[in-house]
């Protein structure tokens, strides 16, 4: 646990946690925080010397305390303990985690069982690697070594004005390599611009991925997956490393819905959002990364949700995905071992590398370098490059840049800077550069606040409420769940079924969606409510039997992104009254869906006891079971979503440097250029005017494509077509096939016309 905290928890939170541990290590401190539970035969004892029942009593007391800091302490201990216990393997257990067997979790596949890479899909690695510099792995000790390393990639290298400065030149520098940065780099380089990509994380080849949470969290997630508000009320999951979130996302690839595009065009001064430019951009990116419907087989996990929605008569649809329709290894959140997912490293980043771009990994972009004179278009200044410092590890260093001890600095001289470090890092980068755009940089943080509901299914069960002829759209029928009768949330296609029943797409456009999350054992253990040691042990012993539903809300309210004393991003967020009510609506629907699918026990990430559902011999709820379900739903409504009593998380962050037609209401103009500084463009999720209500990846990529295409055209460059680009209207057809527009609608699968299989820069392979 100490390793996890030291490497993944921000310094202020880390200090608070270690202070708590110090206080609890004394008898007086334990009495102060634990009351009479810290007394044994009338004498105070430090926490570690108390009997287990007393320790549990203290922590349970904190959970119910009216003092927010005690509630926070209970949540922090529970979360970190769950993550640490189930995340790390130990040599004594043969390289496995001793708790995996007890929870029925198999761990990573053995070499013999590992799904083999698809050679045609991994051809991109041979293109990408020769143009990649990994400063963390190479660790050049000084400027001379750094210059030699960069020169070996064909860059013209020179000395800067200060000792230790290493200067390279480009037409454009892209900060970040995820959905936004990858697309921007690919478009710009393919148009003939000299492009350098700066990425603070590292690159992992498919064959080198261990496929464990212990590796993925610290190396492929921001803050190791522990990126919370100061009060711990919200936790953010965001990708890190070369390829960003596209390397660990759950494959959901929704084209931007029409009602969102209309809102952005009409209310935010962005007419291109409903015009042919955005249509073309969306078709290009959806085609290149291989978006389609028609999953070959829904996992047990998704089948449970589909059966429950069928039982309720609610809308259910199939999620478009950017992977092969037969891909079902369940490892997407730990990195794709086969290349079957169209992430940036197999698509646009590889296109960029093939066109001559250089990707510099392990380079932390500190700030934009600007001219002293006003720009020709009237903006206060113009970009002339980026200052970056080398990273010694993927972990963000909790010291000021001038104190990090780097023997050299990297200066990329370029008149065009593309900020694409993600919704959390882009505003921090701009703020460190003095670019605030009238205060709009860092405002308007939207996160799609999410929580989870889960149900336990008995061995050998048949899902209730769906006749054998029914099917979840686009794939295998929901009833019965096959195999041993266990759900195995970590196995099969991660995300394929969803519901927009209460999303209000035809009205306000704001409301909850239901999907299935990717759930491996440590992430689940860190999130589930804790009701005591015995209850937690029993809960985790049934890990294969649980099926979970993710409730995602399109938020109308917003938060704020700010920087700490080291210049790193931190954030404040708590859902508005409307958004919390939307979450409760989604929680109710999810509970009813799991009950309708045949669960014998349901619970949620709210601090409420689980509900056992009494069923008759036919599997249907008894009258008593039905009454108990209604009472449980009433309790959920009365409890509501409360800070640190409901686990709230986010996998989608948006809006912190938004586009708009009015500089008084946005950070960037419709072309993506900041209102304050010429030549600085935002092309990631930060550019969203509002939240999108669906997985934002394809919208990010489309915005990045449109912004980069515009810059290239204004530079007098021709922008070539993208391999596998869809014909006009194909994205709309995919979205229509996905959600159907009605309850339980079943639409035929829509294949893409190209994808990631055609090799880098070549024509895509059609999917049927």
Give residue spans per PLM region.
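N-terminal glycine-rich phosphate/pyrophosphate-binding loop and immediately adjacent elements
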Residues: 132-264, 388-391, 437-457, 463-495, ...
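Extreme N-terminal leader/targeting segments of oxidoreductases
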Residues: 4-8, 69-171, 705, 713-755, ...
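Core beta-strand elements of the Rossmann-like FAD/NAD(P) dinucleotide-binding domain
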Residues: 165-170, 404-416, 420
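Glycine-/small-residue-rich beta->alpha transition segments that form the dinucleotide
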Residues: 178-180, 201, 414-416, 420-427, ...
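A glycine-rich dinucleotide-binding beta-alpha-beta segment and adjacent secondary-structure elements
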Residues: 135, 169, 318, 328-332, ...
């Amino acid at each position: 646990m100490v390793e996890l905290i030291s490497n993944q928890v921000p310094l202020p939170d880390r200090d608070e946690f270690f202070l708590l541990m110090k206080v609890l290590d004394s008898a007086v401190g334990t009495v102060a925080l634990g009351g009479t539970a810290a007394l044994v035969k009338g004498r105070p004892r430090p926490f570690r010397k108390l009997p287990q029942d007393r320790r549990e009593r203290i922590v349970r007391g904190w959970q119910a305390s009216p003092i927010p800091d005690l509630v926070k302490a209970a949540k922090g201990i529970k979360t970190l303990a769950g993550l640490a216990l189930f995340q790390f393997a130990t040599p004594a257990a043969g390289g496995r985690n001793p708790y995996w067997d007890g929870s029925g979790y198999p761990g990573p596949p053995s070499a013999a069982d590992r799904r083999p890479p698809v050679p045609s899909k991994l051809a991109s690695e041979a293109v990408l690697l020769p143009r990649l510099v990994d400063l963390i792995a190479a660790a050049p000790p000084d400027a001379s070594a750094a210059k030699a390393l960069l020169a070996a990639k064909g860059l013209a290298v020179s000395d800067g004005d200060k000792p230790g400065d290493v200067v390279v030149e480009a037409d454009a520098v892209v900060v970040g390599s995820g959905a936004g940065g990858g697309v921007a780099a690919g478009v710009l380089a393919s148009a003939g611009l000299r492009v350098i990509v700066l990425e603070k994380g590292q690159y992992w080849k498919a064959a080198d991925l261990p496929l464990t949470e212990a590796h993925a969290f610290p190396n492929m997630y921001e803050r190791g997956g522990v990126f919370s508000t100061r009060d711990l009320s919200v936790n953010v999951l965001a990708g890190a490393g070369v390829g960003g979130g596209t390397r660990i996302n759950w494959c959901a690839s929704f084209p931007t819905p029409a009602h969102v595009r209309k809102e952005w065009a009409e209310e935010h001064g962005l007419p291109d959002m409903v015009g042919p430019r955005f249509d073309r951009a969306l078709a290009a990116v959806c085609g290149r990364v291989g978006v389609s419907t028609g999953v070959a087989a829904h996992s047990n996990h998704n089948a449970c949700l589909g059966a429950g929605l069928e039982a309720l008569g609610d809308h259910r649809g199939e999620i478009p995905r950017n992977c092969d329709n037969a891909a079902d290894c369940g490892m997407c959140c730990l990195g794709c071992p086969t290349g079957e997912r169209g992430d940036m490293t197999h698509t646009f980043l590889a296109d960029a590398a093939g066109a001559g771009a250089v990707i510099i990994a392990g380079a932390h972009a500190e700030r934009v370098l600007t001219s002293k004179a006003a720009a020709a278009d009237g903006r206060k200044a113009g970009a002339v490059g980026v200052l970056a410092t080398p990273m010694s590890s993927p972990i963000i260093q909790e010291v000021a840049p001038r104190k990090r001890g780097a023997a050299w600095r990297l200066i990329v001289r370029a008149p065009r800077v593309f900020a694409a470090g993600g919704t959390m890092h882009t505003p921090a980068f701009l703020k460190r550069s003095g670019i605030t755009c009238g205060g709009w940089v860092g405002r308007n943080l939207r996160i799609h606040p999410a929580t989870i509901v889960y149900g336990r299914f008995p061995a050998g069960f048949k899902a209730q409420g769906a006749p054998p002829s029914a099917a979840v759209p686009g794939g295998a029928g929901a009833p019965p769940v096959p195999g041993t009768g266990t759900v195995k949330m970590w196995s099969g296609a991660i995300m394929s079924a969803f519901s927009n029943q209460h999303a209000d797409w035809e009205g306000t456009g704001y409301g909850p969606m239901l999907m299935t999350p990717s759930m491996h054992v440590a992430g689940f253990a860190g999130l589930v409510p804790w009701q005591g040691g015995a209850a937690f042990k029993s809960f985790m012993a049934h890990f294969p039997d649980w099926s979970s539903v993710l409730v995602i809300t399109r938020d109308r309210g917003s938060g704020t992104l700010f920087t700490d004393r080291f210049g790193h991003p931190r954030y404040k967020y708590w859902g508005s009254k409307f958004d919390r009510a939307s979450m409760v609506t989604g929680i109710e629907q999810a509970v009813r869906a799991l009950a309708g699918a045949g669960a014998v026990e349901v619970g949620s990430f709210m601090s409420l006891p689980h509900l056992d559902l009494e069923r008759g011999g036919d599997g249907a709820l008894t009258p008593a079971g039905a009454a108990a379900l209604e009472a449980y739903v009433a309790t959920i409504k009365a409890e509501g979503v409360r800070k640190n009593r409901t686990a709230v998380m986010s996998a989608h962050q948006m809006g912190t440097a938004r586009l708009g037609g009015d500089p008084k209401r946005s950070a960037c103009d419709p072309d993506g250029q900041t209102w304050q500084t010429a030549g600085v463009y935002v092309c990631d999720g930060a550019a969203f005017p509002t939240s999108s209500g669906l997985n934002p990846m394809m919208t990010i990529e489309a915005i990045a494509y449109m912004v980069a295409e515009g810059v290239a055209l204004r530079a007098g460059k021709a922008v070539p077509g993208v391999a596998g680009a869809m014909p006009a209207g194909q994205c709309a057809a995919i979205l229509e096939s996905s959600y159907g527009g009605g309850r339980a609608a079943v639409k035929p699968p829509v294949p893409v016309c190209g994808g990631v299989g055609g090799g880098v820069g070549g024509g895509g392979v059609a999917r049927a």
